[in-house]
């Protein structure tokens, strides 16, 4: 049990044994021994959680203020930032602050926020405004597509418009102050819904006042509004990036040597090499936004390469960008198919990928940079070498941000604003990448995250960093994310991997293994790689289908496509087996 030492457990067991020896000598106990023993066992089970509870909880016994934060961040980040900010608040304000972390994945947090805001606004709508709660209100208050009249227009409001306007004008809250960690896409969605705000009702506290107080932080040389096609902060000041991250490949050098692969992977297409069969660790994109983002960026890299090829070809006809996007999409889908065919299985959590690679259960996999670096450190040998490695595919990934934003109706807007200011300050930025034990660094373990402020990367700071050679600018220059190419197809990427790879994985792997053993006979290979059902045009139609949010139609289409690919893989297997 956490918080209870072995001597304490031994003493507890000895005491209970002595009590039992005395108790069982009582005449009534000797007569009803079995029944009383059963009752006693039940009581012990019920009392154990209280007897063996940790000596200390995460909350202080007494506190003056409480800051509630939704976050997907792991315990190391929560500990370092919670500890450092609470100390700063105590030193400056003389108050004990309790940082109350509410931990879940970003998709779960999104569901909780929508559900909680719906319940909170329903109370406000029915009790404060005395309006009936209607289905139109429930679906409109947080819907950014509900258009409101422009200032000066006198047109009457519909029920949907009234609900939307009242919500945006309100200070309805859910008892949570901040959303900290995740991806910019998640924050853009919450900001559009109206759940994230630039300032509280008074206008005194929030990110907007912080930006006004520190304009030097929000300059191109520090935190640019966008870089490499990725937004670094919201133009309406509802969220801002706090640290940087990119996607890449983690790999195990020992496993590569066992497989006879001398060259370490450096690009996404390396994971499609047949020599990696059964040795790639992947997560299900339908349960991992990280892997979906990696696949999207893989596709964009193929698009950019196809566009460049057509622009450099003097005989190429048509619009290079339009045709390049379509060709690149097809190439990207083929590469995803090969990487999937090489995978052992699809795990349900992206964090398991570097764990499996570090343990030697897989040769390589896709992961976020800081997970790759962390596991590389965990298995580092005394001589400084490590069987684990991580590489960012240059030109194949962007440098995105992990943001923070204040929620509408935050109970402690002053503390929330101070926390955001702290995270962006020199003190907060040092926590992300300074080595433990250095001045301003974390006290327990390195966080291995890259600070968002580009002005942070100077010689003085690099001397204390765990990743002194990191260069966010180089990564950003090598890859430009074009949201207009694939942003609207993000859900389609998840969908196509499900029907083409996850649901059909057994048949896909079986066919791929046979193709490898027969040295890829042309006819069988062509059948295996036939992805016309998921070409760029059909992807647009799938996007329209997913936009309707009709689960029955989605399931029906998924079944249709899964059956088609399963039959296709079985046919490819048989053709390859027969040498065709």
What are these regions (language model features)?
Residues 151-180, 192-250, 269, 391-395:
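A structural signal for short loop-to-beta-strand junctions that line the ligand-binding cleft
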Residues 250-255, 399-414, 431-432:
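A bilobed periplasmic-binding-protein/Venus flytrap-type ligand-binding module shared by bacterial periplasmic
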Residues 34-35, 49-189, 354:
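Early extracytoplasmic/lumenal segment of secretory-pathway proteins
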